[in-house]
């Protein structure tokens, strides 16, 4: 049985040549990112192609997700934040589908790679920074001096706030990456226990009951975490967008 880390290996599927002496290939990671986008697009197409007053299952599911993200965005960024709804909803769907697809046997979890989650976090960071500077100009830098803080504390507070702001893409991306990585490793380890004990005969199969129960419980927990982490990433995105809209708050 393969080790618990091997499931995260990026493997080439189609070699595409070289650029600057470096090999270029269509990998399993790229394949599952494409499948994630296609899955999310298919879900939205099926749920919206026949809009009815009394929604069916597909339409109800899409409306629940729409209202959930819409409410989260309004609560954290205000009514003006709805201008960013397409971005926020797309991020939520991508992460949710990527996490759920990764739960299938032999599937690849793209959100277990820091390069993917960091790219998503940088997209949010650059959107917030560029929009904030374009909309507010130098007033955007009020973000680094919270309202009500005495001026005498500025030499201490401002550097701390700047470092906190710059480190956002790291904390934003590591949270999702670490949770998905740790969850899948744990599942793999317990599944390995079940297979290993089961191969020992009758006594081993009886002993494997506890690891099997743990594996089932961890699978349910990992499904829950797949949804929660999509929500957490989305909520933090909404909070950061609020800084671009209201830097003086």
Curated annotation (Swiss-Prot):
Q: What are the protein's UniProt keywords?
A: ATP synthesis, Cell inner membrane, Cell membrane, CF(0), Hydrogen ion transport, Ion transport, Membrane, Transmembrane, Transmembrane helix, Transport
Q: How does it sit in the membrane?
A: Multi-pass membrane protein
The cross-references to Pfam families, in alphabetical order and at most eight, read:
ATP-synt_A (PF00119)
| GO molecular function terms noted in the UniProt entry | proton-transporting ATP synthase activity, rotational mechanism
Q: What does this protein do?
A: Key component of the proton channel; it plays a direct role in the translocation of protons across the membrane.
How does it associate, per the subunit comment? F-type ATPases have 2 components, CF(1) - the catalytic core - and CF(0) - the membrane proton channel. CF(1) has five subunits: alpha(3), beta(3), gamma(1), delta(1), epsilon(1). CF(0) has three main subunits: a(1), b(2) and c(9-12). The alpha and beta chains form an alternating ring which encloses part of the gamma chain. CF(1) is attached to CF(0) by a central stalk formed by the gamma and epsilon chains, while a peripheral stalk is formed by the delta and b chains.
> What family name appears in the similarity comment?
Belongs to the ATPase A chain family.
Task: Return the PANTHER family for the record.
Answer: ATP SYNTHASE SUBUNIT A
Q: What name does the UniProt record give this protein?
A: ATP synthase subunit a 2
Organism placement in taxonomy: Bacteria, Pseudomonadati, Pseudomonadota, Alphaproteobacteria, Hyphomicrobiales
Q: Which gene encodes it?
A: atpB2
